[in-house]
Amino acid sequence: MRINPTTSGSEVSAVEKKNLGRIVKIIGPVLDVAFPPGKMPNIYNALVVQGRDNEQTNVTCEVQQLLGNNRVRAVAMSDTDGLMRGMEVIDTRAPISVPVGGSTLGRIFNVLGQPVDNLGPVDTNTTSPIHRSAPAFIQLDTKLSIFETGIKVVDLLAPYRRGGKIGLFGGAGVGKTVLIMELINNIAKAHGGVSVFGGVGERTREGNDLYLEMKESGVINEENIAESKVALVYGQMNEPPGARMRVGLTALTMAEYFRDVNEQDVLLFIDNIFRFVQAGSEVSALLGRMPSAVGYQPTLSTEMGSLQERITSTKEGSITSIQAVYVPADDLTDPAPATTFAHLDATTVLSRGLAAKGIYPAVDPLDSTSTMLQPRIVGEEHYETAQRVKQTLQRYKELQDIIAILGLDELSEEDRLTVARARKIERFLSQPFFVAEVFTGSPGKYVGLAETIRGFQLILSGELDGLPEQAFYLVGNIDEATAKAMNLKT
């Protein structure tokens, strides 16, 4: 940990100024800087541009290439407007470092760890460099364990791995944001953990909406900011590619501190992992590298691996990552999503069809997958229940065309029973969320895994065939469904 020369103007003057360079070339967000012989900065060092007459320009760059002839090529983390050849550049002799620890909760940061929420400076002197190695193999926690979310459809059919990586697929307006906020809320309540949200190359409006919704739902506590459950790091669409490429590492660095020092379970959200690859592709072209397949950077797998391998469980704590994945032109073979899939342990697919039916969370039970759903990991009882739920829903899906044309009466007795149970299961997969209480008026429910399994076993066994299907809609555990059925009858 070190005092951070990249996060505030006043500290730059404290940086030892012996290693000064000068800008010799500017091409968009890329600068070439000449240094005195024998004083070349290291790769990934942060450089701070000094304005004329010591006027602070606040442009921080990161060294990407050593060109020879005492020159380096650096990528700017902010706009290069107003920079000129001949300006002095300070080598900070360290990578970009960002504030870490409890004082980051409830705040919004940019890629350099500077707060951008107009709430004043961050109350910490503890900073950490954004570039570091993945934990050594001996530090890893290799035990496979389920990360219980309290959300029935996720825990039963596509369970998350503690310290794993989950891909979140869904279009606009199907409930990605609400699902993310519920997960942030549940990890804080059930696991005593915290969350870090990395907004990578997405719309500024969406980042602002998320912040306002988090304040409204209590995930960010305005009265007592220290009781907030999440830190936000944004590098939005309008930022230079350097910032969008590094903002994921800034968020990850904050999450690593909570895992390694505070020994907590951490949820790391990255929205959107595709934009991280896209920014790397832009930077790669600016640095003059030969493009690879479909115009992507030749270092695509390495860059993705260096980010993903740091997201893991250690003996101290865990980082479980949920990454929104944009699939360009719905082509799953595109190198960007294809490289991401190699790292994922589970996929959560949100369905517009379910959202249209009013079933929230609109997680598709048949399309969502998890490598954790194996009998040796989750146990025989969980595995069997999940498989029977999927088989029932799959059969219902196959029968829907027949029902639409001929009606329910033309089905066999067995198929009619399957349809009735499938409709109950479909409704029982819905759940009231804590963060949606403000909008729905229904109190949120956290359902433990054992309760979830028991509920679906009772539906599958036929014990609840006599209950109306609306009794299963937007309830927590199965006891609430039976109580609701009694109320409907009276």
Swiss-Prot record:
Alphabetized UniProt keyword annotations: ATP synthesis, ATP-binding, CF(1), Chloroplast, Hydrogen ion transport, Ion transport, Membrane, Nucleotide-binding, Plastid, Thylakoid, Translocase, Transport
One of the Pfam families matching this protein, by short name: ATP-synt_VA_C
SMART domains: AAA
Places the protein is found: Plastid, Chloroplast thylakoid membrane
Source organism of the structure: Ipomoea obscura (Obscure morning glory)
Record text on subunit structure and interactions: F-type ATPases have 2 components, CF(1) - the catalytic core - and CF(0) - the membrane proton channel. CF(1) has five subunits: alpha(3), beta(3), gamma(1), delta(1), epsilon(1). CF(0) has four main subunits: a(1), b(1), b'(1) and c(9-12).
HAMAP family on file: ATP_synth_beta_bact
Gene Ontology terms for molecular function: ATP binding; ATP hydrolysis activity; proton-transporting ATP synthase activity, rotational mechanism
Cross-referenced InterPro entries: AAA+_ATPase, ATP-synt_VA_C, ATP_synth_F1_bsu, ATPase_a/bsu_AS, ATPase_alpha/beta_chains, ATPase_F1/V1/A1_a/bsu_N, ATPase_F1/V1/A1_a/bsu_N_sf, ATPase_F1/V1/A1_a/bsu_nucl-bd
Gene Ontology cellular component annotations, sorted alphabetically: chloroplast thylakoid membrane; mitochondrion; proton-transporting ATP synthase complex
Function, as annotated: Produces ATP from ADP in the presence of a proton gradient across the membrane. The catalytic sites are hosted primarily by the beta subunits.
Coiled coil residues, start to end: none
Gene this protein is translated from: atpB
Main location: plastid
Name used for this protein in its record: ATP synthase subunit beta, chloroplastic
Membrane topology, from the record: Peripheral membrane protein
Domain of life: Eukaryota
Family from the record: Belongs to the ATPase alpha/beta chains family.
One record GO biological process: proton motive force-driven mitochondrial ATP synthesis
Residues bound to ATP: 170-177
Annotated EC: 7.1.2.2
SUPFAM superfamilies according to UniProt: C-terminal domain of alpha and beta subunits of F1 ATP synthase (SSF47917), N-terminal domain of alpha and beta subunits of F1 ATP synthase (SSF50615), P-loop containing nucleoside triphosphate hydrolases (SSF52540)
Catalyzed reactions: ATP + H2O + 4 H(+)(in) = ADP + phosphate + 5 H(+)(out)
